[in-house]
Amino acid sequence: MALSAAASTLARLGYYEKLAGILGIIGLVLLFWQRTRQPFYPDLPLAGETPHRRWFSLRTRFRYYTDCASLFNEAYHTVRFHASTSSSSTLSRLNAHASQYTKHGKGVLLPSVGVHTAVVMPESALDWAMSQPDSALSITHAFADLNQTRYSLGDARYWRDPWQLTLVKAHLAAVTPALVPQLNDELADALAKRLGTDTDSWREMELETTLRRVVAQTLSRLIVGPELCRDEGYLDLAYKVVLGVMTTIFATLPYPDLVRAVTGPLASWHTQRRISRIQRHLEPLYRERLAILRSAKEDQPPDLLMAMMRFAQKKRPEELADPAIIARRVCAANFVAMHQTTIVLTNIILHVLGSDAEFSTIAALRSEAAAHLLSSERITKDAFAQMKVADSVAREATRLNFPLGGRASPRTVMRDGLVSPEGIRLQRGTTVSWLAGCAQLDPEAFPEPRRFDPFRFSRGDGDGEGERDTFVKTSARYLPWGHGKHACPGRFVVDYVVKMALAQLVTKYDLAWPEDYGGKQPPSVWLAELSVPPPRARIMVRRRKV
């Protein structure tokens, strides 16, 4: 009877539900197996645990999934010790040194996803780490593992050698005068399609779902040009691949390589088929761009695909000859550009709508947009530089909602014998990171740190490091773009798109909360260490009569 009931229940479960159940069972087995191994960094303390523990308790690992924000906050400011398991003399001695943790110069271990443990470096080690050569601390190896590129895109090369991304900064500088006005026009078309043009009736929409399509169309103009950026079939596939990469990450990252070899192909099966369909969409463009390269025409399309193929012709000819590789590099560029921009823009709009009435945030944004960015003729680099209110709003919203989880600037240790200035002896193969989300909410750096102050950075208060802190400027207290020589090259694209989107939204549309929200902003949701916009958050829009 019991077996029959179990079989009946299993039959009703979907593919991903069955996969999740199997992975959960495997995870528990591996967790108990891991606890029998040698200690990981025995000289570093375990956040949330009593002194001298060798492994995280199940309670602390469970807390990672249910109360990660406070766990990380403790690790940033201090370490939690439990009176029930420590003598008063031990507590006094340890509390006397509590200020030594990541904010004040000492590393700490934190539970991470699945069976893993994270090595978190102190803030004081950031500049040292960012100055290390890639042969010592590698960002590309860290992100290849984090994004599970071997499975999600079929090969680790797309992040271990991410030339499709490093091209962006130089390419954008060369084409900005011609391309940015085109992006603005594309954005206007995408907003009109999804938000409508009715000036009499309010329309309710799911914010993040709508912005996915708006961002996909706008950034596809940059990445693949006008031929595909309005092709709904291509856009649908492009974002499904983005979501498929996320699914693969969730299905593989928690486990050791042996298990990943099984779960990776299973979780990415649909994604690989969709990438093949994207390749078919790209084939005509690929052949056309090859012909342009062979003819050595000077007048070439300004999109990233053309720049990628031009680079590959000179530096990676074996990749240029394979349209499947080019298609996967386009998908890698889509993943970074579309996913990050959508999350950032969603958080910004939620905070703008939820900002305190005393700030009149929308009125300030409208006034600034009217002065600097309402016509294509005005869309210049200098015009963007004058948009200090929009810049401050974007930085403040991103400060409050770190888009990459609680940790940032991951680096994989590539050789033994590497020792930080604080004396932390790093083990080869370890990935280290920093508690960026906590640093961005530090009350010593930001008065009223959890309050959205749209003008915090336009006043010049910032983090006290001199010049005004802009949306794209990185520091130890602001790491959504990373830091140092490998800071995200695509952040300048996000900067342009966010400011254009804010300008168009506030000048062309009225925005409001649905009645059932009671005028209040819905809170972000924590998924382990990821803070994400509230699922299915809705807003009301109506075209303005202007």
From Swiss-Prot:
GO terms for cellular component: membrane. Pathway: Secondary metabolite biosynthesis. This is Cytochrome P450 monooxygenase fumoB. Its main location: membrane. It comes from the Eukaryota. One of its GO terms (molecular function) is monooxygenase activity. The keyword Kinase does not apply. It comes from Cordyceps fumosorosea (strain ARSEF 2679) (Isaria fumosorosea). One of its GO terms (biological process) is secondary metabolic process. The gene is fumoB. Pfam families: p450. Heme binds at C488. The chain crosses the membrane at residues 13-33.
